[in-house]
């Protein structure tokens, strides 16, 4: 069904003004969802200047040229790690094609920008722009739904990335923009418009582990099966209930996503024990926490402390390292999430993907499926012996994103494997 877009009709004007360019919601005419395939800045299109892009090279270098959850390189990396275990999709010996960059843009108004100063609640993130789209084009386009504070084009090392951001003066303009322009044609490209989110703080600031000195001066609590939405601050706030928290950490992967476990350090043993008694087995956002004493806590000649150690070790057998504990539990979590899930379900938010390369990691799932929409969870389905099956289950927050995932990624060649994707069903 066509959306009423006012002046943005299907008739293309000779004017280069963006308000006269074609803009419709005819999804059947959707061109290939590749930021660089149809317009690579050749001689037929003039290059335009990125006037003052707020996400400049400084931003891209700080975050590895990638923007967090909603801004993955698209299409997903084709290199893939093959079933033989080659890590070619990361640029190794798999022969996978690298990401094609847009044309180099000039910066006549380049300036430094602190991303934390922007009002993300009033901002949108726009994907699949043509490489000659400018901030002025975005401002004029989205100015039809609300007053625009600023519009920007995202670049990487001087190259147009086919993405941009728009900040409005009012929050309600965000939903108006998404409703009106998500999926609409603009400059012959189908736009993908989403709520903008702040970039994660530097991973080293969040994921660095507590030093041995910090642990020696306190009592560590290790928490497994944390909701993936929980960061160190919310973890700290939660565990304040049991005492003064010296430090809280959530373990992140190389993409800056939570790995589902973390730690809290208290100054006293009593606070540590109270936290274990309070939170172990508690359900938070549908996940049951497993809370235990940290491995490196000091042993003290204290009957109560030693008894507590014995009780804990009785419940978990021999004491493995933190990484081993976490890995085992992550496998258990994946098994529970994917248990009884099969392909061929009715329309729902869960996606069943088979024929993945056996060496695909969980973080790869976010790279592959994340650009489509917000993911609640994604897990690889293991065999009973823990070996990979090449199957994953992905839960999207929105049904429309699940629909779009099947439309765009079914039969997609990933790491030399043709993915088979359908709605999931739980038997």
UniProtKB/Swiss-Prot annotation:
Residues 22-32, 50-60, 300-317 have a biased composition (Basic and acidic residues). Residues 35-44 have a biased composition (Low complexity). The modification Phosphothreonine is found at residue 130. Keywords: Chromosome, Cytoplasm, DNA-binding, Nucleus, Phosphoprotein, Repeat, RNA-binding, Telomere. It is found in: Cytoplasm; Nucleus; Chromosome, Telomere; Cytoplasm, P-body. Methylated by HMT1. One of its GO terms (cellular component) is nucleus. The modification Phosphoserine is found at residue 24. GO terms for biological process: nuclear mRNA surveillance; poly(A)+ mRNA export from nucleus; telomere maintenance. The keyword RNA-binding applies. Residues 1-101, 300-319 are annotated as: Disordered. The keyword Phosphoprotein applies. InterPro entries: Nucleotide-bd_a/b_plait_sf, RBD_domain_sf, RRM_dom, RRT5_SRSF_SR. Pfam families: RRM_1 (PF00076). Its main location: cytoplasm. RRM 1 and RRM 2 recognize preferentially RNAs containing the core motif GGUG. The atypical C-terminal RRM domain (RRM 3) does not interact with RNA/DNA, but is crucial for interaction with the THO/TREX complex. PANTHER family: RNA RECOGNITION MOTIF RRM DOMAIN CONTAINING PROTEIN. This is Serine/arginine (SR)-type shuttling mRNA binding protein GBP2. It comes from Saccharomyces cerevisiae (strain ATCC 204508 / S288c) (Baker's yeast). The gene is GBP2.
């Amino acid at each position: 069904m066509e959306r009423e877009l006012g002046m943005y009709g299907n008739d293309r004007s000779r004017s280069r003004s963006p308000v006269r360019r074609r803009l419709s919601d005819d999804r059947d005419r959707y061109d290939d969802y590749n930021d660089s395939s149809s317009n690579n800045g050749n001689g037929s299109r003039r290059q335009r200047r990125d006037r003052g892009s707020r996400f400049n090279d400084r931003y891209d270098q700080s975050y590895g040229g990638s923007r967090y959850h909603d801004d993955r390189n698209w299409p997903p990396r084709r290199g893939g790690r093959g079933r033989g275990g080659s890590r070619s999709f990361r640029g190794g010996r798999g022969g996978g094609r690298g990401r094609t960059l847009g044309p180099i843009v000039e910066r006549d108004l380049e300036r430094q920008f602190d991303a934390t100063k922007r009002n993300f609640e009033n901002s949108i993130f726009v994907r699949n722009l043509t490489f000659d789209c400018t901030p002025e084009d975005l401002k004029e386009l989205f100015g039809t739904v609300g007053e625009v504070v600023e519009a920007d084009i995202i670049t990487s090392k001087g190259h147009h990335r086919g993405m941009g951001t728009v900040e409005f003066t009012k929050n309600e303009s965000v939903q108006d923009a998404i409703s009106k322009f998500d999926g609409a044609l603009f400059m012959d490209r189908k736009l993908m418009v989403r709520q903008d989110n702040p970039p994660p703080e530097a991973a080293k600031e969040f994921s660095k582990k507590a030093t041995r000195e910090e642990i020696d001066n306190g009592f560590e609590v290790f928490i497994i099966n944390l909701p993936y939405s929980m960061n160190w601050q919310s973890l700290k706030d939660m565990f304040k209930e049991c005492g003064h928290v010296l430090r809280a950490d959530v373990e992140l992967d190389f993409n800056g996503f939570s790995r589902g476990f973390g730690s809290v350090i208290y100054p006293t043993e009593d606070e540590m024990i109270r936290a274990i008694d309070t939170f172990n087995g508690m359900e938070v956002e549908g996940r049951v926490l497993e809370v235990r004493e940290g491995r490196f806590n000091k042993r003290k000649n204290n009957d109560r402390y030693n008894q507590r150690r014995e009780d804990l070790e009785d419940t978990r057998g021999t004491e493995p390292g933190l990484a081993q504990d976490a890995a085992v539990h992550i496998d258990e979590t994946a098994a529970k999430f994917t248990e009884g899930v099969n392909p061929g379900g009715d329309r729902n938010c869960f996606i069943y993907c088979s024929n993945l390369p056996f060496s695909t990691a969980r973080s790869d799932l976010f790279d592959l499926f994340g650009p489509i929409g917000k993911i609640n969870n994604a897990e690889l389905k293991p065999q009973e012996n823990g070996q990979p099956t090449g199957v994953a289950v992905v839960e999207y927050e929105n049904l429309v994103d699940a629909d779009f995932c099947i439309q765009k990624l079914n039969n997609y060649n990933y790491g030399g494997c043709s993915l088979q994707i359908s709605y999931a069903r739980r038997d």
